[in-house]
Amino acid sequence: MADEGKSYNEHDDRVSFPQRRKKGRGPFRWKSGEGNRRSGRGGSSVRSSRLEDDDRDVAMSDVQDAPRVRYTPYAARPNRRGDNWNERTRIHVTLPLRRDRSAAERGGAGTSQDGTSKNWFKITIPYGRKYDKSWLLNVIQSKCSVPFTPIEFHYENTRAQFFVEDASTASALKAVNYKILDRENRRISIIINSSSPPHSVQNELKPEQVEQLKLIMSKRYDGSQQALDLKGLRSDPDLVAQNIDVVLNRRSCMAATLRIIEENIPELLSLNLSNNKLYRLDDLSSIVQKAPNLKILNLSGNELKSERELDKIKGLKLEELWLDGNTLCDTFRDQSTYISAVRERFPKLLRLDGHELPPPIAFDVEAPTTLPPCKGSYFGTETLKNLVLHFLQQYYAVYDSGDRQRLLDAYHDGACCSLSIPFTPQNPARSNLAEYFKDSRNVKKLKDPTLRFRLLKHTRLNVVAFLNELPKTQHDINSFVVDISAQTSTLLCFSVNGVFKEVDGKSRDSLRAFTRTFVAVPASNSGLCIVNDELFVRNASADEIQRAFAMPAPTPSSSPVPTLSPEQQEMLQAFSTQSGMNLEWSQKCLQDNNWDYTRSAQAFTHLKAKGEIPEVAFMK
C-alpha cells in the first residue's frame, strides 16, 4: 500500500458519486453536490510561501501535549519553588477584567464567526488524570447550575483541563469547587483562569472551507474499495489553490475531517493518513465511534514517538496497520517486540507495515456473563430475624448517639474486638482512612505476631473504650444487609453490611462502607451478648454513595404514638395491621402522605414492590 506509492486519486471513476441513499449504506454518501466553487477564489495565483514555511513549526503550535509548548499561551508558568497545596488548589477567577486593556492584551477574549466577542476560561482539575473523562464531566455537570460544553478536554501531566466560553459558565463552575466527592471521598478542586481562545477555535475552518474540504475528500475516496486517501492532505493542489490550510495535527482540522467521514462515509474500511506530521493521536480517537468498521489504517511517515499513542485508537478492530517512518518504530529492540506491542492493542491484526503476520493466538473464551444481583438479607427463620433486627436497631441507636459507653451491656466480659481497613501499596497513614490506620489489624499487611495480638481489644471495658475513640458516626439503617451464617442453641454468628457517615472531625460528612461480623451468645434479658466483634471499614463506592441515606430513617422516640388525635390513632392501628409495618414506620408513612389513608396505602405498595422498605420497618 504505502510502499507501492499508490494514490487513490489516480482513479477516473472517483470524480462523481451517486447520491447518498441511506445512512450507513451504499458505496458513497456525500451530501455535497455543488459545483466547483474555486472560480474567482484565487485562480492560479498560489501563495507558495505557505508551503515553503516549516510545516513542523506551524503544526507544533497546535499540539497541546507536545513537549515544551503545552498550552503555554493560556497560563503563566507556575512558581514551582513557592508552590504549596493551598496555592495549587485555590480557585483563580480574574473577573472582572480591566476594561482599559485590549482583548489581545488580556488574553481572555476572542471573536466568533458572527463577530460577537467572547471571553474564554481554562478549567483545570488538579490530579484529574486519574478520573475517567465521562465520569468527571458528568459529575461536574450534575453539580453545575449552568449547562456547559467543554471545549478541548485533555490531560496535561496529572491535570485534566478544558475550556468554556463565557463568564457566567466560569462562575457557575467556580461554585462547584470542592462540592464533588470522588470514589475515595476526596473533594475535587476546580481552578478557573482567564484564557485566550483555544487553538481549535482560533484555527476553526469556516463553513465554506469545510464544504471545499468535503469536495476534495470526495475526489480522494474510492467507493469500490470504501477507501479514503488523505496522504499529505495539506499539500493537496486543490486545497493550495483555494488557499485552505488543512493541517491534520490541528484539533479543529482533524475534527472537521472526522465529522465529514461520520456524516458521509461511516462505513469506511480503509483510511490513509500517511505523511501528515501527526505527533499524537488524541484528536483521531473519536474515529472508533465515527468509523467503527475501519479495517485498514495507514499512519506511516508521521512523527509518532511512543507506542502509547496507539492506546488512543485501540478500540478499532484493525486487520492492517502501517507505522513505518515513525520514531516509535525505532524504540523496540527487535521485530518480535514491535509486533507484540502493536498486537497487544490490535489483537486481530493480520498485516503490519505491509508484512503478513503469523496468525494471532486465540483462545475459546466463553461469552462474558453478568453476575447475578446480590440478594437481600438472610435470617433463616422469622424468630431469628426479629431477634437480630431488634438487637441491631438498639445497638446502632446507642453507637450513633455520641455516648458509646452505654454499649457495655451489649458485650460479654471476655469479649474481643478488632478493626481493619483495606491494604493499599501507598502510604495509608496519609489516606482519608488515616483515622483508622493506627488500629488496623489487616493481616495481609501486618506480619508481626506481637503487634497482631496487641491490636486485638480484649474484655468489654477495653472494647467499649476503643469504640469510643473511633470517629462519631451516623449509620444508614436502610442500607443494612444482614446474613446469619451460623446458629446453635448457644451461639449466633451474623454479619452486617452497610454505609455510615462520619459526623465530626477532619472527615466530616465522608461516607464509608463497612462489614461487621458479630458472634453472640444468649443474654439474660432474652437478647444477645457479643463475644466477638470484627469491623472492616472502607471507602464507599460511587453506587453506595448515590444510594446512601436516600430514605431517611424515622427519628426514634420514647413513645410510638405521640400526641395523635383519636381518629389518627385509630387510622395508625389499622394501617399498621394491614401493612405489617410497626407503629413507628406506619406513622411515618401516614404523615408523609398528610394522613390520607388511600395515598399512604398506594405509596406503601409501590415502595414495597421496589424493595425499598427496610427490614426494620416490619420489626414489631
UniProtKB/Swiss-Prot annotation:
SUPFAM superfamilies xref list: L domain-like (SSF52058), NTF2-like (SSF54427), RNA-binding domain, RBD (SSF54928), UBA-like (SSF46934)
Gene Ontology molecular functions: RNA binding
Domain called RRM: residue spans: 120-199
Region (RNA-binding (RBD)): 2-119
Domain of life where this protein originates: Eukaryota
Residues where Omega-N-methylarginine is found: 41
LRR repeats: 267-292, 293-316, 317-344, 345-372
InterPro entries named in the record: Leu-rich_rpt, LRR_dom_sf, NTF2-like_dom_sf, NTF2_dom, Nuclear_transport_factor_2_euk, Nucleotide-bd_a/b_plait_sf, NXF_fam, RBD_domain_sf
Comp. bias (Basic and acidic residues): 1-15, 49-59
Ranges for region Major non-specific RNA-binding: 60-119
Region named Disordered: 1-88
Any single GO CC term annotated in Swiss-Prot or TrEMBL for this entry: nuclear speck
Region (Interaction with ALYREF/THOC4 and LUZP4): 2-199
Cystine connections: none
Cellular location(s): Nucleus, Nucleoplasm; Nucleus speckle; Cytoplasm; Nucleus
Residues with the N-acetylalanine modification: 2
Location of the motif Nuclear export signal: 82-111
Modified residues (Asymmetric dimethylarginine): 41
Motif Nuclear localization signal, chain ranges: 66-101
Pfam families linked: LRR_NXF1-5, NXF_NTF2, Tap-RNA_bind, TAP_C
Keyword hit for Methyltransferase: no
SMART domains according to UniProt: TAP_C
Sites bearing 3'-nitrotyrosine, chain numbering: 127
Assembly information from the UniProt record: Heterodimer (via NTF2 domain) with NXT1. The formation of NXF1-NXT1 heterodimers is required for the NXF1-mediated nuclear mRNA export. Forms a complex with RANBP2/NUP358, NXT1 and RANGAP1. Associates with the exon junction complex (EJC) and with the transcription/export (TREX) complex. Found in a mRNA complex with UPF3A and UPF3B. Found in a post-splicing complex with RBM8A, UPF1, UPF2, UPF3A, UPF3B and RNPS1.
Name of the protein described by the UniProt record: Nuclear RNA export factor 1
Source species of the chain: Bos taurus
